[in-house]
């Protein structure tokens, strides 16, 4: 007789980030019978593939932080058949609004991830405009064992009849059985430390990072 498989134990799992890795992670966890919450601080899925023409302002404490790392004319450096998920290939679509090239532009990758999200109903798992600000292992004396506490901040926009839209921030603490971090590596640039670059006489202007470039890239 074959051994009886162990019953699946459903866990409450947090996934941080709704980019490519976060989306497929959420899908696989739900397929295994777990309840999943995806935290995404942006307003849409896509992670590093979300393009904006905005850039960070000067390095001041009050500057606006822009998390996109794409320039306008960027194309993939891998063929599309190497970029898709195994059971959801990145196929060219017969649609005038899509990019059928083997090495497509960033917008096509973004649309592929949006298609993937719709196909598997992942959107219902995502809390948009919600930033995770702290994750820690819960101490046993708090009544839990091997659990994780997540503190998050969610921006909510409320519009009352006849009044302007108001924004409020809701802070929340929740307990999860497991946490999967899928935040990527391209949000904050790594600035090279060059001896003497803090001197005003070394360079006549500030450094410009590739992350802050949007146009005028040769293709």
Predicted features by range, described:
Residues 16, 132, 173-186:
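Short hydrophobic core segments
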Residues 9-11, 164-178:
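Core beta-strand elements of the Rossmann-like FAD/NAD(P) dinucleotide-binding domain
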Residues 6-38:
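N-terminal Rossmann-like FAD-binding beta1-loop-alpha1 element of flavoenzymes
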Residues 128-147, 153-159:
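A conserved short coil-to-beta-strand element within the FAD-binding core of flavoproteins
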Residues 90, 105, 109, 118, ...:
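Glycine-rich dinucleotide-binding loop and its adjacent helix/turn
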Residues 18-19, 38, 98-109, 122, ...:
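Amphipathic alpha-helical protein-protein interaction segments
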Residues 21, 92-103, 114-115, 159, ...:
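Short interface patches used for recognition in eukaryotic signaling and trafficking proteins
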Residues 41-115, 139:
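Glycine-rich active-site loop/strand segments that organize a redox cofactor
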């Amino acid at each position: 007789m074959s051994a009886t498989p162990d019953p699946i134990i459903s866990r409450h799992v947090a996934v941080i980030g709704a980019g490519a890795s976060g989306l497929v992670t959420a899908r696989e966890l739900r397929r295994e019978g777990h309840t999943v919450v995806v935290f995404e601080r942006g307003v849409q899925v896509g992670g590093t593939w979300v393009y904006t023409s905005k850039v960070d302002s000067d390095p001041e404490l009050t500057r606006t932080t822009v998390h996109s790392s794409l320039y306008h004319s960027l194309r993939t450096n891998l063929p599309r058949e190497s970029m898709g998920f195994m059971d959801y290939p990145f196929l060219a679509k017969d649609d005038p609004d899509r990019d059928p090239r083997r090495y497509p532009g960033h917008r096509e990758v973004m649309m592929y991830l949006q298609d993937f999200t719709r196909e598997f109903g992942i959107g219902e798992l995502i809390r948009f405009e919600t930033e995770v600000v702290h994750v820690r292992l819960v101490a046993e004396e708090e009544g839990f064992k091997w659990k994780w506490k997540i503190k998050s901040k969610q921006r909510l926009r409320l519009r009352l009849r006849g009044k302007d839209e108001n924004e409020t921030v809701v802070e929340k603490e929740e307990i999860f059985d497991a946490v999967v971090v899928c935040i990527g590596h391209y949000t904050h640039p790594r600035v090279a430390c060059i001896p003497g670059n803090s001197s005003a006489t070394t360079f006549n202007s500030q450094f410009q990072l590739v992350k802050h470039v949007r146009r005028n890239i040769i293709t």
